Amino acid sequence: MLYDIVIIGAGITGSMLARELSRYELKVAVLDKENDIANGATMANSAIVHTGYDPVDGTLKAELNVKGARKYPKICEDLHCHIKNTGAFVVACSEEEEKLLDVLAERAVCREIPHEFLSGDDAHAVEPNLSDNITKVLSFPTTSVIYPWEVAIACM
């Protein structure tokens, strides 16, 4: 059989690509070296839907992290997959590290990513298991986690 498109890899990226291409009248095949969907990097990743505050300005990663994070709640709703809004803390234990938090906050402002600074005490009130050495926290309340294998399987 001849195919219009062959996708190499049945992880979350290949599966999502196959789902998008299924909207068109194309013959699409998905190939993977593993014996099942999402058995490679997808199975072993952190499952965090990154909001996009970390990548350097002007990079494709910065652009796509922000766009993807904003799309994921709808994607998971459409696919009937779980998504959990956990939020994320980036912590500082010194003045030098606090300066790095300021850089991340500037990126978040430019990218319109919700964030807020917390004192070490305020952060401990939310998460008591944090180190006592924490002086400042940058909170990203819209950070979420998914089950990547669930999303990959739902796409197929």
Name each model feature, range by range.
Residues 17, 72, 104, 154-155:
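Aromatic/hydrophobic pocket-lining residues that form π-stacking "cages" and hydrophobic walls in ligand
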Residues 3-30:
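N-terminal Rossmann-like FAD-binding beta1-loop-alpha1 element of flavoenzymes
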Residues 132:
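The feature captures the short pre-catalytic strand/loop hairpin that immediately precedes
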Residues 22-44:
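Glycine-rich FAD pyrophosphate-binding loop
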Residues 138-156:
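Helical element adjacent to the flavin cofactor pocket in flavoenzyme catalytic cores
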Residues 88, 135-137:
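Short hydrophobic/aromatic beta-strand or adjacent loop that forms the aromatic wall/cage
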Residues 47-126:
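Dinucleotide-binding Rossmann-like beta1-alpha1 core, especially the glycine-rich loop
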